[in-house]
Structures are given as structure tokens and as C-alpha cells.
Amino acid sequence: MAKYSSKINKIRTFALSLVFVGFIIMYIGLFFKQSVLLASLFMILGLLSIGLSTAVYFWIGMLSTKAVRVMCPACEKETKILGRVDMCMHCREPLTLDKGLEGKAFDESYNRKNSVK
């Protein structure tokens, strides 16, 4: 079975990885000190990656404020749901607000508009 996590945590992890990728790109630029053009190019690309990360963090923050808050029945902690189905942020329990999906096996495809399941 695939390892699932909540959508908010996935997007936050992506944003954090952009920060580290940006730092690595900038660090690679240090190896090209002889060529000012190449060093500058890597520094700018790294800075763009970090800037993109900031935008993603801002976007997920705005999205997180609009997410539905529910109490997880398994761990009894408050968590947020994005879409029709999501996972608990704390215990990874599948959650849904759609009565038609209760009791069904968790599948991320339920969030797609053209889901046939």
C-alpha cells in the first residue's frame, strides 16, 4: 500500500525542498568563481528557487486558512481537510466529508472532478 500524507503537508514538504534545492544550486555556483557569468547564473537560479518556495508557502498558507477543520475520529486531534478525501495530519487516518465515500478504501482519485469510482 502506498504511503499517503495530508495534502497540506505534501505541499509544505515541496516548498521546503525548493529551499534546499535553491541552496544547493547556489552552492554549486561557488565552484564557478572563475567565471563571473556562470557563478551569477547559479546564484540567480538558486535565488529564484528560494523565491518560488516563498510563493508556495504563501499560497499553502492562504489555502490552509480556507480548509475545513475536523476532529479525527482515530486520534481525536483537530486536522484540516482539502478536497473530498484527505488524511489526518497526525495519524494518517483517511478522512472524508462525503457521505457517499464513507467506508470505501482511500483513493486520492476521489478528489478529481471526473472520478468514476
Curated annotation (Swiss-Prot):
Domain of life: Bacteria
InterPro entries: UPF0295
Keyword annotations from UniProtKB, A to Z: Cell membrane, Membrane, Transmembrane, Transmembrane helix
Subcellular location: Cell membrane
Membrane-traversing stretches: 13-33, 41-61
Membrane topology: Multi-pass membrane protein
CC terms in the record's Gene Ontology section: plasma membrane
Pfam short name (any one): DUF2614
Family: Belongs to the UPF0295 family.
Name of this chain's protein: UPF0295 protein RBAM_008830
